[in-house]
Amino acid sequence: MTYKLILLRHGHSEWNAKNLFTGWVDVDLNDQGREEAARGGELLVENNVLPDVLYTSLLKRAINTANIALDKADRGWIPVKRDWRLNERHYGALQGKDKAQTLAEYGEEQFMEWRRSYDTPPPPLDDDSEFSQAHDPRYADLGDALPRTECLKDVLIRLMPYWESDIKEDLKAGKTVLVTAHGNSLRALVKHLDGISDEAIAGLNIPTGIPLVYDLDENFKPLNPGGTYLDPEAAAESIKAVANQGKK
């Protein structure tokens, strides 16, 4: 028995374009992002990789990416499951800050530690910040579980129970699963799937809007380690752009 998992990072967002740390701030796609999402759906059709069920975060840039892609693929009718555990990493007090200014203010070592280290979160975000989710009704049931900051390790810890209880169960049922989420929630999942070390994960970037397909064996180990991008050339270019964020 083999399983098929499709990972799709949301398209370019309004804050990607402004080079701001986004995290849990609910910004939408820009025109480029909507075009990327549409192209992602076209790639699913061209490669005959059509999902049976969709998982997304609670953030509109992921939700709208999925909606656009599925519309292009004529799969808007499939079941949808949304969960906060697929949200982007919470960037704490960095949310809303300009990446280039943060780099200049704190230096490259601190900047990269906050942005890319596995287990070092940024300073926490105050609940009275305009970028806080402390009073957001979609997270009202989380209570003390609502993060004020996260590192990638925290994202993995919150994501793994959902992977085990829900996503894997749909895969076991023979469904092709599409997970439309965010750079860091997908990096956490890829780290788990590919067994990437805590140190090596710092160098992994995931492009926006390009489906990444994993074929998994009966033990949910990749038959194609690293997955297969449905547009490898575009993925390589986009990965470079993601890696350079904060340097402009």
Swiss-Prot record:
Keywords: Gluconeogenesis, Glycolysis, Isomerase. SUPFAM superfamilies: Phosphoglycerate mutase-like (SSF53254). The keyword Cell cycle does not apply. It is an enzyme of class 5 (isomerase). It catalyses: (2R)-2-phosphoglycerate = (2R)-3-phosphoglycerate. The active site is at residues 10, 88. Substrate binds at residues 9-16, 22-23, 61, 88-91, 99, 115-116, 183-184. It comes from the Bacteria. Pathway: Carbohydrate degradation; glycolysis; pyruvate from D-glyceraldehyde 3-phosphate: step 3/5. The record marks 182 as: Transition state stabilizer. Catalyzes the interconversion of 2-phosphoglycerate and 3-phosphoglycerate. This is 2,3-bisphosphoglycerate-dependent phosphoglycerate mutase.
